[in-house]
Structure formats: structure tokens, C-alpha cells
């Protein structure tokens, strides 16, 4: 397998990380995961733009253009002959003697690799269980940073409880999942938290909002309370690798009929169609 290290394609065994890389020591960096369908990077420009935004928000000046990044990632996918899978890319602030503050002029370190993705067909078709948990993350969740410790801990609690995802609540209001955006269908309207600093504005989320409008479904980007969530007709979550997955039980309680609902199914079908169109056009 080839990996990308600072613009160069090398064998994975040749790649190394300096012990004083600030990403390794502080989680001082940003990342993206981009899905590959039929050899095509889905939503590449949107992911690349968000990558640059995240870098700018934490003061990292990337030494390449969006076009350079897209070209390198496409080469990586081609070199590894990836048909169905994903690319993980991250940039750290660079290497420096360990201290919290940093000097200007550090050289950012960018790495990327490909991996296979198993489409969660069972989960998409039949739905999953989720739990709720308190959202104790920092208040810049709009930045896709490497700092994911609370997400990891909460996802593990969900896993140990036999659930697929943990839905996070801040002051009694739904923000998002540990690795997904969250939507509730209430009185036929799709409700989801607005894209502010409390959530990551997912690329899949943006696609879904476009599909909601295109399909004439009502949308309301306003926070959902815990009580509203548990009484919703439908709940679904979205992410790059999960796509759209129904939540049919929450904290052991059935949601709606306990099966994937009609709005979720409609959006799943529309999303799959958009994937096919993107893969055939490219």
C-alpha cells in the first residue's frame, strides 16, 4: 500500500512520525475522511474546503492549494486501486520541542492513506440502537480537530451498552452523535441542530439538507430537546461512512414504530441516487 506523506507517495512501511510531532503529543491538527465510490472521491471539493477551513481556524497555514490536495488524494486512490473505501487525511502543526505554546514558522506535516469500508447495509435497512449521553466536549466542535478523546470514550460506552451510537445532549438539547449528525422527524418535519460551533457541519449533512429541499420535505434547523427526541416519529443519523442510518431504539425505548420510517427511507434512496450520479459523472 502507498501512503501520502507531505505530497510524496511512499510505501506504508517507509512512513514515520517524529516523537515531537505536535499532533502526536497534543492532538494539534485537523483531519478529514472522504468516501470513495467506484474509484471516485465523493464530495471531494466540499471535504477539501472544510479541511482548509479547519486549518485556518487553528492557525495552520497549509503549504499547498485545494487543487494540489485534490490531485494528491486522487493519485493516492488510483495508486492503491481503491474502488470502494475511503481516504483519511490529516495535517498536524509540525515538529517542535514539547511545550504548549509554539513558535511561528513550523512546517505542517500532512499524511493520508486509504482503507476499505464495509457498507453498513444491515444497519441501514433495519436500524440501530442508540443511547444518550452528556455532551462534555469543547465548544469548537465545528473544527474537525484531532482531539477526539471524549468522542472515543462516549462511543465506547455506547458499544459496551450494545448500541451503535451515542447521541449527545448539552443542557438538555441534542447536539450530534459521537461520529454523526442527528435528525428527528417531528410532525412530518425533519429537525436538526443548526450548524454553529456546537456541531460539525457534516458533508453528508449538507447533502441531506439539499435532498430534503429537493424532495419537498419540511426542514427546521432548530435544536431538539431530549423529550422531543424520544417522542419523535423517526430518528436517523448520518456520516461519511455510515451514510444514513435509522435509529429505531433510544435508551432501550422504541422510536415511532420501532422500524425505519418513511422519511428516512425516502432520504436513503435519494442519497444513494446522488452517489450513483456522482460516480457515473466523474
Swiss-Prot record:
PROSITE patterns hit by this protein: AA_TRANSFER_CLASS_4 (PS00770)
Name the EC number(s): 2.6.1.21
Q: Which Gene3D superfamilies match?
A: 3.30.470.10, D-amino Acid Aminotransferase, subunit A, domain 2
Q: InterPro entries from the entry?
A: Aminotrans_IV, Aminotrans_IV_CS, Aminotransferase-like, BCAT-like_C, BCAT-like_N, Class-IV_PLP-Dep_Aminotrnsfr, D_amino_transT
Catalytic residues of the enzyme? 144
Q: List this protein's GO terms for biological process.
A: carboxylic acid metabolic process; D-amino acid biosynthetic process; D-amino acid catabolic process
Kindly list the positions annotated as binding substrate: 31, 98, 100
Q: Name one Pfam family in it.
A: Aminotran_4
Q: Please give the catalytic activity noted in the UniProt record.
A: D-alanine + 2-oxoglutarate = D-glutamate + pyruvate
**Domain of life of the organism in this record?**
Bacteria
- Keyword set, alphabetical order: Aminotransferase, Pyridoxal phosphate, Transferase
Q: How does it assemble?
A: Homodimer.
The role this protein plays is: Acts on the D-isomers of alanine, leucine, aspartate, glutamate, aminobutyrate, norvaline and asparagine. The enzyme transfers an amino group from a substrate D-amino acid to the pyridoxal phosphate cofactor to form pyridoxamine and an alpha-keto acid in the first half-reaction. The second half-reaction is the reverse of the first, transferring the amino group from the pyridoxamine to a second alpha-keto acid to form the product D-amino acid via a ping-pong mechanism. This is an important process in the formation of D-alanine and D-glutamate, which are essential bacterial cell wall components.
- The identity of this protein, by name, is D-alanine aminotransferase
Please report the organism this UniProt entry assigns to the protein: Bacillus subtilis (strain 168)
Q: Which gene encodes it?
A: dat
